[in-house]
Amino acid sequence: MMLIRYLSQIGRYFLMLKEIFNKQTKWSVMKKLIFKEIDDLIIDSLGIVCFISFFVGGVVAIQTALNLTNPLIPKYLIGFATRQSVILEFAPTFISVIMAGKMGSFITSSIGTMRVTEQIDALEVMGVNSLNYLVFPKIIALLLYPFVIGISMFLGIFGGWLAGVYGGFTTSDDFIMGAQMEFIPFHITYAFIKTIIFAMLLATIPSFHGYYMKGGALEVGKASTVAFVWTSVSIILFNYILTQLLLGS
């Protein structure tokens, strides 16, 4: 019974994706909605992303240094490990999980509140495709999400450099040499491919849970929690699949 319910929800989700791109809202209206979503979802997230990235990058460098107890192991591996950790996993994946809480709860609660207050019903009565009106601007706004992850990568490595050098764990030259050593450009491509997929999940899964929720204010809170859980699970699952497909061979 539970399996049938889950499969039904997945089917409903894909039908929602199809409906989002039907009957487009006028560009003059859509343009304002897109800029509002960029402000709410991208600009407002930069502060927390920068803060977390900087300090986690520092922690990665310090923990790597503390585990290099053998004097024969070169110190430039601190920079190498920090770069690999930040670019491959921390910036694209774990920042996205954090954003599932920050962006996801905002999206679910805002759309859920509109459902509770019957604003979505009013849009439908006026002949507006409410899914296109509410969700499409979020998808377009989150096309800028790779820009946020790029900043996260830079600050993570910069935080690692500061912690490693000024913590006395390595020299600046060693860290930079390690950060440049055996660099594979495809790793950046891989990270941004993941980021684009995660951006789509961040825009649509919370929207789905907000749009189809039933009940009152209490249910809005519950829907936000469920949306966060399922967005996080989807991100981790797709992270595994994409890693296997893109790096497994």
For every predicted segment, state its role.
Residues 52-55, 96, 136-167, 197, ...:
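Hydrophobic alpha-helical transmembrane segments that constitute the membrane-spanning cores
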Residues 97-121, 138:
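Membrane-cytosol interface at the C-terminal ends of specific transmembrane alpha-helices
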